[in-house]
């Protein structure tokens, strides 16, 4: 006979193993204070809940790590594909040539099929093949050359004097020299012939600017070195090198800069609110051109004179195609 069935109804809940959880049956204990609620509350297993929360937290962390790894892989793939595309574009622009025909405007665009195979284990950034628009710099025949020779306006050169220098002594004893260490950590010295300016640093390095030719720049640098020698320093003349050449010219006609920047977006930028000239970055030779609507052109970034001449002969037919006809 079942023990629970022999007990009164009000005591069956107490005798059952789940008596503490049986609703409707009040529980009384002499140890309970007077007025304590008699309705039992279910006992929660906090250990199982904490384990579930920890598992969910670990899963979320793993998902975040996987997402970060995927983003890093995508960024690396994009960088690799951009590098491959840039190298291919540079190679194609260096190999392009045009055949000029009389009575026709120079060709300004060239559509070339570019196939970029994805690297092993990567996904292609764009479908292959693609047909990017790359500007052409048409070669002008000798009979149709521009006839304009850019004039050199400034040459920047550097030289190493091979010894440490006391700039205060140089500024006090040399003529046409100024030194303000709070403003600039070099002595600024000037001479009249050739009219140039030198920046002399305490390490012995010197920068010479303002010369109009390579010979003038070398001559001016030697004169500055001689001045330092006369002040008692064991100065030498080492590692003379031309760092930058700036030239300018005028094509004698106005230019539509808006059309030029739309045609050559890869190589040019034009923000008239910030700077009135169009900035054109030529790849070969590596020259930066400042083109103004009036027809004035400034070329900078050359190491030798021939690079300035070559860059202008490349850009002249393009400027001719964007000549204003009003």
From Swiss-Prot:
The keyword Magnesium does not apply. Keywords: DNA-binding, Nucleus, Repeat, Transcription. One of its GO terms (cellular component) is nucleus. DNA binds at residues 154, 190, 205, 244, 281. Residues 1-21, 114-146 are annotated as: Disordered. Transmembrane segments: none annotated. PROSITE patterns: TFIID. SUPFAM superfamilies: TATA-box binding protein-like. Pfam families: TBP. GO terms for biological process: mRNA transcription by RNA polymerase II; positive regulation of transcription initiation by RNA polymerase II; RNA polymerase II preinitiation complex assembly; transcription by RNA polymerase II; transcription by RNA polymerase III. It is found in: Nucleus. Residues 114-125 have a biased composition (Low complexity). One of its GO terms (molecular function) is aryl hydrocarbon receptor binding. Sequence repeats lie at residues 152-228, 242-319. It comes from the Eukaryota. Belongs to the TBP family. This is TATA-box-binding protein. It comes from Macaca fascicularis. The gene is TBP.
């Amino acid at each position: 006979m079942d023990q629970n069935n022999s007990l009164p109804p009000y005591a069956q809940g107490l005798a059952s193993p789940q008596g503490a959880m049986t609703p409707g049956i009040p529980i009384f204990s002499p140890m309970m204070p007077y007025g304590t609620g008699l309705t039992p509350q279910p006992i929660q297993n906090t250990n199982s809940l904490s384990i579930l929360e920890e598992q969910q937290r670990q899963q979320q962390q793993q998902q975040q790590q996987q997402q970060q790894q995927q983003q890093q892989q995508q960024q690396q793939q994009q960088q690799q594909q951009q590098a491959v595309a840039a190298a291919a574009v540079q190679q194609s622009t260096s190999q392009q040539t045009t055949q000029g025909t009389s009575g026709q405007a120079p060709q300004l665009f060239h559509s070339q099929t570019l196939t970029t195979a994805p690297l092993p284990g990567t996904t292609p950034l764009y479908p292959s093949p693609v047909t990017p628009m790359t500007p052409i710099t048409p070669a002008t025949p000798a009979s149709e050359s521009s006839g304009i020779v850019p004039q050199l306006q400034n040459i920047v050169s550097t030289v190493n004097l091979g010894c440490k220098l006391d700039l205060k002594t140089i500024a006090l004893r040399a003529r046409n020299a100024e030194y303000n260490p709070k403003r600039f950590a070099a002595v600024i010295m000037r001479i009249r012939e050739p009219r140039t300016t030198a920046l002399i640093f305490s390490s012995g390095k010197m920068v010479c600017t303002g010369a109009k030719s390579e010979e003038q720049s070398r001559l001016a640098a030697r004169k500055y070195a001689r001045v330092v020698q006369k002040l008692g320093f064991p100065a030498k003349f080492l590692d003379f090198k031309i760092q930058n050449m700036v030239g300018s010219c005028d094509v004698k006609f106005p230019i539509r800069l808006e059309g030029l920047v739309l045609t050559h977006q890869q190589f040019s930028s034009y923000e008239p609110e910030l700077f009135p000239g169009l900035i054109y970055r030529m790849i070969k030779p590596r020259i930066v051109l400042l083109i103004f609507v009036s027809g004035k052109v400034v070329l900078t970034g050359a190491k030798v004179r021939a690079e300035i001449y070559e860059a202008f002969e490349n850009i002249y037919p393009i400027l001719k195609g964007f000549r204003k006809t009003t």
